[in-house]
Each structure stands twice: as structure tokens, then as C-alpha cells.
């Protein structure tokens, strides 16, 4: 998640990031760059390779290997929230399960991942 561009301020409670988890990151990068003309940029993360997708000056997503080995490839949307801890607590009260508690992602802020009561995954990103 990039916060390097002044014109990329996140809108609270809007989807602000899209992340692809796949064991074949090279194949996915090749597919999406050829299909849509997206550009890529490496983003340093401890212990993981992370590649961000860009279109023009806008960075909007990334690709990495799944956090859980053996997980099927999938896209995950992140919603920007001004109070990550408070939003997680509210989500739990509404029946969500926290899959990844608040985690710092370098200079790009903090994230968390939850499963909604219907079973769908959603990411949260501090804004």
C-alpha cells in the first residue's frame, strides 16, 4: 500500500486497495501487465516479496504469495478506515472474525483482515 503520492489520499470507508494473493506471482504479474498495461513497482516488506500495480501515476493494488501456504489464489479488497482498532471492535460485535489483527506495513500504515458473518474476507487499512 503506497502512501507516496499526495494525490492518492484515501477516502474513509471506501475501497482503497486491491491485493492479489497467488503462489504464482510472476505469472500473475505477466498476465495483468500484458492484459491491462499495468506497470509494477517493488515494495519492500519484511520476509515477503510484494509488487505493486500502477496505472499512470496511480498505485492501486499489489500481488504477493498467500499468507497461508496452500490457500487458493484470490483478490482481497481493502477499505480505508480512520480508526482501525475501533472498526475491528465494531466488526467483531457485528459477528465478524478477525483473521489478521492490526499489523504495521512499514510507512504505508496498518492493516487488518476480517471475515464477515457471511464468510467473505475484507481488508481494512488505516487512513
Language model regions located:
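N-terminal beta-strand motif that seeds the catalytic metal site of vicinal oxygen chelate
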Residues: 1-29, 74-77, 125-127
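Conserved short beta-strand elements that form part of the metal-binding/catalytic scaffold
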Residues: 4, 38-74, 117, 121-126
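The feature marks the first
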Residues: 15, 58-61, 82
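Residue-level detection of beta-strand scaffold positions
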Residues: 17, 35, 50, 76, ...
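Vicinal oxygen chelate
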Residues: 24-25, 54-56, 78-121
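Catalytic core of tubulin tyrosine ligase-like
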Residues: 32
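Short secondary-structure junctions
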Residues: 37-43, 97-102
Amino acid at each position: 500500500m503506497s502512501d507516496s503520492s499526495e494525490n492518492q489520499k484515501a477516502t474513509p470507508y471506501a475501497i482503497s486497495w486491491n491485493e492479489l494473493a497467488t503462489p504464482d506471482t510472476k505469472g500473475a504479474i505477466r498476465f495483468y501487465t500484458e492484459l491491462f498495461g499495468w506497470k509494477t513497482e517493488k515494495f519492500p516488506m519484511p520476509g515477503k516479496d510484494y509488487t505493486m500495480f500502477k496505472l499512470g501515476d496511480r498505485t492501486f493494488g499489489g500481488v504477493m504469495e498467500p499468507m497461508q501456504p496452500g490457500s487458493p489464489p484470490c483478490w482481497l479488497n481493502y477499505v480505508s478506515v480512520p480508526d482501525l482498532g475501533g472498526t475491528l471492535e465494531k466488526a467483531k460485535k457485528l459477528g465478524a472474525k478477525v483473521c489478521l489483527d492490526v499489523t504495521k506495513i512499514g510507512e504505508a500504515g496498518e492493516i487488518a483482515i476480517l471475515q464477515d458473518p457471511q464468510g467473505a474476507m475484507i481488508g481494512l487499512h488505516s487512513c
